[in-house]
Curated annotation (Swiss-Prot):
GO terms for molecular function: structural constituent of ribosome. PANTHER family: LARGE RIBOSOMAL SUBUNIT PROTEIN BL34M, MITOCHONDRIAL RIBOSOMAL PROTEIN 34 FAMILY MEMBER. It comes from Mycoplasma genitalium (strain ATCC 33530 / DSM 19775 / NCTC 10195 / G37). Pfam families: Ribosomal_L34. NCBIfam families: rpmH_bact. This is Large ribosomal subunit protein bL34. GO terms for cellular component: ribonucleoprotein complex; ribosome.
Length: 48
């Protein structure tokens, strides 16, 4: 049986990236909370 996590940078960015977060109200809420907590990284797309 193969493992469930098969890493892909493209899929990761499309699902959890900045543009994906901005696309929905709940995603924008996530960004707002992460800014409030002063997270070093807002989204996975800021990994580069």
């Amino acid at each position: 049986m193969k493992r469930t996590y098969q890493p892909s940078k493209l899929k990761r960015a499309k699902t959890h990236g900045f543009m994906a977060r901005m696309a929905t109200a709940q995603g924008r809420k996530v960004l707002r909370q992460r800014r409030f907590k002063n997270r070093a990284q807002l989204t996975v797309s800021s990994e580069r």
